[in-house]
């Protein structure tokens, strides 16, 4: 069975420069995740600068998600300071029922 997870990750203080330096490796890793990604994007502050990330991911279980997170460049490099993970069930996407 495939499980869906909502991952909300907040950057640490003053991490924008480091985030941007690590971003190419983050995006490469995301590209390698392929169909594990339901959707993903950056959280923005009031000035439109990135301050975190939101991802909806599919994995067989929480252990597989944790394995991904333990190797995620933003985690390894200390960009993400606080990560909240919740189980999720996407029902509607782009206005269409998917489950």
For the regions a language model picked out, list residue spans one by one:
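Conserved, structured core segments of small domains
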Residues: 1-99
